[in-house]
């Protein structure tokens, strides 16, 4: 299986011993195995898994900093490639800045993946590696690298106007491009476009209509990565949900990612927002699952809407069967899902 955000490959006897000393309780294999789901981003994270994540972030940051320090001693910049598997080096969490990286580079698949890179703070610059890679599967007889390059650039370009990356590039075997001069011409034009966009957008606060927050179980740790399975690849089962995040990447909004834990810890944060978005299938981390059994959560959202805030639900927002409802905000949303338990309602003998 693939999981960029997974921690299942980060377990060792040494790590478990250290974790148990810090957390004060025994680590169990089930905390990672998670009924066979391995804590993928659709699973509502357990307290133990969140503890383990926090522990790994701190430990990985320490080790990564040692590597960065060695690099700096040799007078070189330290750059990290974002992607595939970044155990512990969570770019949107506080520990990341302590590593001391000079730059982050990542592969750009769409607007969301571009913002995943460009929104990272605590580095001197960010870089996007565009598609296609210079590999034989594209640069071959019958291949059309220009088409792929156009789709990639046009898809990601709108996000640059909201938050630009600092550099762009490609990866692969350069000699493969020699037989595709039209591709080289297109890349030249694309680079000129980028320079124009960057000159006008860098350091400028773009116009924002409203302040919007995506609400889920993860919050800022999964900023711009919501519903993203294996680098922006199309998934029939979730494209409508991932599409919401993609739209936000280039829309005129000040976008934030908040968790239910954030609301429980500081309900007042909702007062600074104009719109809250809850998007995904019911009983997943993206809509919250059993967290809606906590009256403090639903009360905070209701108060937010009562005071003029907007709430947008896509899919099954607040979806969790509890106390006679599937949508825990059914009264507020004006809609309910029939799950079989109320088929006998509104009927006559």
Each model region followed by its residue ranges:
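Polysaccharide-binding and catalytic clefts of secreted carbohydrate-active enzymes
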Residues: 1-101, 107-116
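Hydrophobic faces of well-ordered beta-strands that scaffold small-molecule active sites
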Residues: 78-82, 102-106, 124-133, 166-171
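Acidic (Asp/Glu)-rich catalytic clusters
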Residues: 94-98, 114-126, 160-163
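Active-site clefts of carbohydrate-active enzymes
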Residues: 117-148, 176-180, 220
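Aromatic-Pro/Gly-enriched surface loop or interdomain linker
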Residues: 157, 163, 185-273, 315
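A glycine-rich, often tryptophan-bearing local segment used as a flexible ligand/cofactor-contacting loop or short
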Residues: 283, 287-349
């Amino acid at each position: 299986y693939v999981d960029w955000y997974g921690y299942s490959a980060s377990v060792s006897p040494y790590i478990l011993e250290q974790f148990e000393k810090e957390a004060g309780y025994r680590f169990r294999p089930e905390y990672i195995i998670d009924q066979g789901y391995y804590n993928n981003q659709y699973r509502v994270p357990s307290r133990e898994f969140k503890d383990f994540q926090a522990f790994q972030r701190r430990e990985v940051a320490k080790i990564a900093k040692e590597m960065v320090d060695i690099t700096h001693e040799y007078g070189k910049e330290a750059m990290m490639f974002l992607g595939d598997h970044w155990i512990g080096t969570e770019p949107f969490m506080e520990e990341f800045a302590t590593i001391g990286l000079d730059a982050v580079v990542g592969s750009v698949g769409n607007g969301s993946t571009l913002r995943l890179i460009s929104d990272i703070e605590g580095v001197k610059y960010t870089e996007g590696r565009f598609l296609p890679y210079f590999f034989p599967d594209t640069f071959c007889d019958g291949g059309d690298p220009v088409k792929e390059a156009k789709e990639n650039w046009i898809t990601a370009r709108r996000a640059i106007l909201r938050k630009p990356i600092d550099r762009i590039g490609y990866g692969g075997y350069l000699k493969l491009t020699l037989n595709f001069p039209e591709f080289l011409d297109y890349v030249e034009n694309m680079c000129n476009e980028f320079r124009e966009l960057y000159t006008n957008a860098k350091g400028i606060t773009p116009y924002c209509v409203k302040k919007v927050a995506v609400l889920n179980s993860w919050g800022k740790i999964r900023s711009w990565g919501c519903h993203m399975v294996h680098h922006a690849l199309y998934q029939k089962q979730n494209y409508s949900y991932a599409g919401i995040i993609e739209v936000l990447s280039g829309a005129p909004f000040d976008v934030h990612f908040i968790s239910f834990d954030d609301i429980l810890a500081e309900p007042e944060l909702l007062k600074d927002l104009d719109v809250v978005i809850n998007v995904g299938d019911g009983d997943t981390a993206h809509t919250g699952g059993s967290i809606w059994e906590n009256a403090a959560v639903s009360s905070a959202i209701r108060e937010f809407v009562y005071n003029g805030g907007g709430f947008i639900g896509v899919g099954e927002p607040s979806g969790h069967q509890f106390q006679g409802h599937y949508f825990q905000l059914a009264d507020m949303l004006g809609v309910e899902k029939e799950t079989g338990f109320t088929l006998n309602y509104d009927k006559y003998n």
